[in-house]
Amino acid sequence: MVCPKILMKCKHDSDCLLDCVCLEDIGYCGVS
């Protein structure tokens, strides 16, 4: 899994970069 360690706000996985997913409970992208 490649997920840049950049705090990006998100509402959906498609808002995130590469293999990141949207962690909806915190509203930021991360690794599942």
UniProtKB/Swiss-Prot annotation:
Main location: secreted
Pfam families: Squash
Subcellular location: Secreted
Taxonomy, superkingdom: Eukaryota
Database matches in PROSITE patterns: SQUASH_INHIBITOR
UniProt keywords, alphabetically: Disulfide bond, Knottin, Protease inhibitor, Secreted, Serine protease inhibitor
GO molecular function: serine-type endopeptidase inhibitor activity
N-terminal signal peptide: none
SMART domains the UniProt entry points to: PTI
Name this polypeptide is given: Trypsin inhibitor 2b
Organism ancestry: Eukaryota, Viridiplantae, Streptophyta, Embryophyta, Tracheophyta
